[in-house]
Design a protein with these regions (language model features):
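N-terminal strand-loop-strand
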Residues: 1-36
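Residue-level marker of positions within ordered structural domains that often coincide
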Residues: 14, 95, 139
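Unchanged
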Residues: 41-132
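A small-molecule sensor/coupling module
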Residues: 133-137
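Short, charged, intrinsically disordered terminal tails
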Residues: 142-146
């Protein structure tokens, strides 16, 4: 079985005194479908570097690595081939940039970018494994300043 490895991030920030996290609506997906930014690990690239890069490419905001949150593992079928995929997620603190201001190179991949209230993110994200990563981020930040 073919294997694929990706990495993504839970980018957290405080906006108007409220903790928030960045979420994307991937291109071609319906309104209201929120996901975490992520992408394939480049050849020779470390997963945590991929996570920081993908978050910036897909949200327009740059984050600082805090820690690994965990992995999501699943099998899917593409063009008749079963693929085992591992996606590693990392907690990132907002550093700079404007959410939603994407370069033309990546704008086609992302239909929308929003800050979601951190405490509501586990309910608002579309995919179960990503909801778990949002919960892990909340637990990791418990009592820690964002």
């Amino acid at each position: 079985m073919k294997r694929e490895f990706s990495a993504g991030g839970v980018l957290v920030h405080v906006l108007d005194g409220r903790p928030v996290m960045a979420a994307i609506r991937p291109g071609g997906k319906p309104e209201g479908l929120w996901a975490l930014p992520k992408g394939r690990i480049g050849e020779g690239e470390k997963p945590e570097v991929t996570a920081v890069r993908e978050v910036e490419e897909e949200t327009g905001a740059r984050g600082t690595l805090v820690r690994k949150l965990g992995d999501i593992r699943y099998v899917y079928t593409w063009q008749g081939e079963r693929i085992f995929k591992v996606v590693s997620f990392y907690l990132l603190r907002y550093e700079a940039g404007e959410l939603g201001k994407l370069s033309a190179e990546y704008a086609h991949e992302v239909a929308d970018v929003q800050w979601l209230p951190l405490d509501e993110a586990p309910r608002l994200l579309a995919y179960g494994g990503e909801r778990d990563m949002a919960r892990h981020a909340i637990a990791a930040l418990d009592g820690e300043p964002i």
